[in-house]
């Protein structure tokens, strides 16, 4: 049975879309207008949250972008894109996966909402600026970690790079990347040059 993924351009669903391309898995892509809960109300019948990503694989339904990436590695035995529990960097690998959304993407979404997406009368410039600074402060662990590394874990590309890479890419799309440290910007450029990322971008 074919994996089905619902996606919006530039949204967190980019993570599993990128992972699918890197892993060479067959899938059916449904691209929706953003936000789908407002512009495609019938989507709520499939996913009551109205969010993307939404992935269906047989009886499995998932809505969390990094969780889907983790599922794909384990379900389809694409261990070259992940680390196993007996690996010495396994804890760090999991930490980067969770760090990507809970620590990095969260403040970005508030910056995006209150600085860019709300009508002018509802914009909150100070709130947006506070969350911009919060996001940049939360990059400190990554800034130090990537100084002498090409990728986050085990000297090779994994879904941890997809998870963190999307957060950096979103920062670029919403104008925060001008404050990235040079090594972090260089890391993002390496990720964007990957064939899987290029193919993903062509399908958006």
Positions of predicted regions on the chain:
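GST-like domain detector, emphasizing the conserved glutathione-binding G-site
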Residues: 1-126
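Short, solvent-exposed turn/loop segments enriched in Gly/Ser/Thr/Pro and often Arg
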Residues: 33, 159, 204
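Phosphate-coordinating loops and pocket residues in cytosolic domains that bind phosphorylated ligands
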Residues: 45, 193, 202
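Residue-level recognition of oxygen-bearing side chains
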Residues: 67, 183, 196
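Active-site-flanking alpha-helical
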Residues: 73, 167-168, 201
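Short, flexible loop/turn segments with low-complexity composition
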Residues: 85, 199-204
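GST-like fold's C-terminal all-alpha helical module
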Residues: 97-193
């Amino acid at each position: 049975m074919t994996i089905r993924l619902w996606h919006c351009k530039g949204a967190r669903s980019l993570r599993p879309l990128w992972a699918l391309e890197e892993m060479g898995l067959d899938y059916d892509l449904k691209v929706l207008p953003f936000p789908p809960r407002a512009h495609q109300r019938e989507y709520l019948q499939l996913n009551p949250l109205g969010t993307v990503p939404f992935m269906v694989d047989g009886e499995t339904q998932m809505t969390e972008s990094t969780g889907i990436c983790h599922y794909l590695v384990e379900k389809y035995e694409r261990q070259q894109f992940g680390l196993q529990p007996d690996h010495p960097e396994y804890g760090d690998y999991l930490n980067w996966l969770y760090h990507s959304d809970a620590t990095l993407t969260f403040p970005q979404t508030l910056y995006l909402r209150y600085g860019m997406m709300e009508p002018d009368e509802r914009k909150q410039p100070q709130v947006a600026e506070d969350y911009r600074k919060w996001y940049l402060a939360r990059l400190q662990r990554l800034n130090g970690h990537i100084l002498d590394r090409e990728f986050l874990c085990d000297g090779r590309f994994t879904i941890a790079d997809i998870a963190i890479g999307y957060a950096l890419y979103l920062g670029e799309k919403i104008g925060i990347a001008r404050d990235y440290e040079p090594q972090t910007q260089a890391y993002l450029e390496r990720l964007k040059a990957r064939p899987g990322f290029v193919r993903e971008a062509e399908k958006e």
